[in-house]
């Protein structure tokens, strides 16, 4: 489990889908990240940024980049997922 100040995060695989469990002071949130078929590697935490009542968790899994923004005052969550382009060369 990864923790910092008021937010603890754990990554789990349930029924083929990666989830983030976010534990804040008085609540827990289960956040679906993506399927293990498209995201075969366990997501790993790249960075954690605290700024003005928010925590931003940046994760990666292969070509996937995920940003979880936690608004500490309200307990609301925003998830942004980006898939990087493939670097494999293909003959045309």
UniProtKB/Swiss-Prot annotation:
Keywords: Eukaryotic host gene expression shutoff by virus, Eukaryotic host transcription shutoff by virus, Host gene expression shutoff by virus, Host-virus interaction, Inhibition of eukaryotic host transcription initiation by virus. It comes from the Viruses. InterPro entries: Bunya_NSs. GO terms for biological process: symbiont-mediated suppression of host gene expression; viral process. Belongs to the orthobunyavirus NS-S protein family. Inhibits host transcriptional machinery, by producing modifications to the phosphorylation state of the C-terminal domain (CTD) of RNA polymerase II. Inhibits phosphorylation at serine 2 in the heptapeptide repeat (YSPTSPS) of the CTD of RNA polymerase II, suggesting that the elongation step of transcription and/or 3'-end processing is prevented. Inhibition of host transcription machinery leads to shut off of host cell protein synthesis and inhibition of the host innate immune response. NSs also seems to be involved in the nuclear relocalization of host PABP1. This is Non-structural protein NS-S. It comes from Bunyavirus snowshoe hare. The gene is N.
């Amino acid at each position: 489990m990864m923790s910092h100040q008021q937010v603890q995060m754990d990554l789990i695989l349930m029924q083929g889908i990666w989830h983030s469990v976010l534990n804040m002071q008085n609540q827990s949130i289960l956040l679906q990240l993506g399927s293990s078929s498209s995201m075969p590697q366990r997501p790993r935490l790249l960075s954690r940024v605290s700024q003005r009542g928010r925590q931003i968790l940046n994760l990666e899994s292969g070509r996937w980049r995920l940003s979880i923004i936690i608004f500490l005052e309200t307990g609301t969550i925003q998830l942004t997922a980006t898939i990087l382009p493939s670097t494999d060369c293909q003959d045309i």
